[in-house]
């Protein structure tokens, strides 16, 4: 099985009412969740822009769009398989990205997106390898 075959889209439950919305991006019950803490971060992408463009030989990540929409472009570094995943907020999903899969998040809309991410490792520049899509 190639690394890109390990990418999983995990449906989430978006709870909305008059006050706003609630969404669990990481529940702690995920298949590949580590037993230690990594990093949680947010990133915003402007219309027509892309964020990322790299892969991690060791770290794995989980991505959840919490506002707007984007396309997550993936490429397996070993097999060179490609995959594009549409990530509109309304779809309420988290995408697991295994190590060795290059990723870039492209804003294909006319509004900003906000992405919530979790990685199982603390940031290490040596584990972030630039990749041009």
Regions found by a protein language model. Give the residues of each.
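Glycine-centered loop/turn positions within well-structured domains
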Residues: 103
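Non-catalytic, conserved peripheral segments adjacent to functional cores
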Residues: 1-94, 108-133
